[in-house]
């Protein structure tokens, strides 16, 4: 079903990004679904630490570094 979220576990915190450092770039391991076991980079807003479970609406996109304009 397309409206279901996919769980992903944070395995590494890469660093802060964005104009004021408001986003954190993390590497997550997809826990279920067709991309199970794949590790991708995502940008996360809010507090996050290694071991947290994120619910991703989309697993195909990888994060790119957010630049300062």
From Swiss-Prot:
Q: Which PANTHER family match?
A: 40S RIBOSOMAL PROTEIN S28, SMALL RIBOSOMAL SUBUNIT PROTEIN ES28
Q: Give the InterPro entries listed for this entry.
A: NA-bd_OB-fold (IPR012340), Ribosomal_eS28 (IPR000289), Ribosomal_eS28_CS (IPR028626)
HAMAP family, per the entry? Ribosomal_eS28 (MF_00292)
The record ties this protein, via PROSITE patterns, to: RIBOSOMAL_S28E
Alphabetical list of Pfam families matching this protein: Ribosomal_S28e
Q: What is the lineage of its organism?
A: Archaea, Methanobacteriati, Thermoplasmatota, Thermoplasmata, Thermoplasmatales
Annotated GO biological process: maturation of SSU-rRNA; ribosomal small subunit assembly; translation
Belongs to which family? Belongs to the eukaryotic ribosomal protein eS28 family.
GO molecular-function term, one example from the UniProt record: structural constituent of ribosome
**Is the keyword Ribosomal protein assigned to this protein?**
yes
Q: What is this protein called?
A: Small ribosomal subunit protein eS28
Transmembrane stretches, start-end: none
According to the UniProt entry, the coiled-coil residues are: none
